[in-house]
Amino acid sequence: MTLRIVSLNVWGGLLHEPLMRYLVDVDADVLCLQEVGRTPGSQSDWLVYRDHGVELQQRVNLFEELKAALPDHDAFFLPVARGDLFDGDRRIASEFGLATFVRRTYPIIGQAVGFVHGEFSPDGWGAHPRSRNAHCIRLFDYERGYPITIAHMHGLRDVAGKGDTPARRHQAEALVEIIRQVRQEGDRLVVCGDFNVLPDSVTFEILGRLGLVDLVTSRGHDDTRTSHYRKQPRFADYMLVTPDVEVINFDPVAEPEVSDHRALLLDLR
């Protein structure tokens, strides 16, 4: 038996039908999801996010829908902010952040969540670059008889692009500290997410201190985006592992397209 991890920026659930179908059918043991919404009390399916002339449809209660679709998983929602979405001119407060789903056959024996940039914003989305967080979990693998630590992050978005900045260096250092709160000596380690950086980022040097190597670039993949994203460069999402992780299969999934990001699928032992 292998352990399957899928990391995906779900784009606010914009491609809702294929997204839901894929996340059920892929049968992952651990889902690490970025850009997930939750709107307590809302009766709408869709609301609109507005920011400086940009409008995006948001699936209002994607987290709750995923919980219902994945009844065999424990579910965690980890917001970075509460801000306004719109139903016409009506403002509705909504939360936005990470979600993690873990099959219940893998007990969670440790975890930490923390901010890698900024802090929780309760009264609006905040100025760019907006707050970002990370979630780290330690699971026990009954079949193998020892734990594994898994972390994911949504890296900050800078309107100037994906190049390195002092904030991105701090983000990587903060991610390492969150991981160190959870991981024990000897644990296999997987770190993934939409990092919003380029392959030459100092992020990978900093994560390399934990023995991590990126599977996207080291295996010759040059695209983690879908046809819904038309800009260059094509890198945003990464999946890193330590040498004691036996990689059975790794795939930046080209089809089906369920977001403007590709899902990163890892089967490991």
Stretch-by-stretch model annotation:
Residues I5-N9, Y22-V54, F101, I137, ...:
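Active-site beta-strand/loop signature of hydrolases that rely on acidic residues for catalysis
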Residues V6, A81, A151, G155-D164, ...:
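Membrane-proximal envelope and lipid/glycan-remodeling enzymes
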Residues G37-P147, D251-E255:
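Structured beta-strand-rich core segments of catalytic domains in phosphoester-bond hydrolases
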Residues G13-L23:
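Short, acidic/polar
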Residues G13-L15, R38-G41, G83-L85, R157-G161, ...:
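Active-site environment of divalent metal-dependent phosphoester hydrolases
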Residues Y106, E177-L189, N196-R269:
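Metal-dependent phosphoester-hydrolase catalytic domains
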Residues S7-G12, G126, P166-R169:
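Short, flexible loop segments at the rims of nucleotide/cofactor-binding pockets, characterized by
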Residues H154-L175, D200-G208:
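Active-site-proximal segments of metal-dependent phosphoesterases and phosphodiesterases across multiple
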